[in-house]
């Protein structure tokens, strides 16, 4: 059983070849994406900053948080950002069998659709951890799995200046930048609001135009 479970989890990475990691390198475009929200305090501040800088991005929302804060979700959609499904509860899909995976994907999708008034366009697995049961659920929903090419802050805290420097160093045409507007990592939201203006300036300083995910892919 342990070996079978390991194959179920690890074997799914063969299927991530069908997922989207970046846009075309032929166009000077990039997209900012935000995971783990909505957060009732941080997400509105992020939306304010994006509006101030004239940027639209993509928010990968946790279903149960979307159900708790539907007003924030409606604002995300109303301001022209793409809405994505980040599962119902942010469980690692490596720890989910087929039935639990179905709940995470479909319940998340439905909760976000109800809060946003429109279905999610994309899906992103928590921590990038997929499984074999996930992909057959995404096709009928028409939600491709989208990961990222640049992650300024991953599982370890990174101060705003570090995040800006990583973006400047690693991003290029087609970049999908993965940011976090809720505290999956403690304090992530506060660090993001400090880093976001510098990230926008750094990417634009490289000649990149920041566009919604739907215009990048």
Report the location of each language-model feature.
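His/Asp/Glu-enriched short active-site or ligand-binding loop at hydrolase and phosphoryl-transfer sites
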Residues: 129, 134-170, 208-217
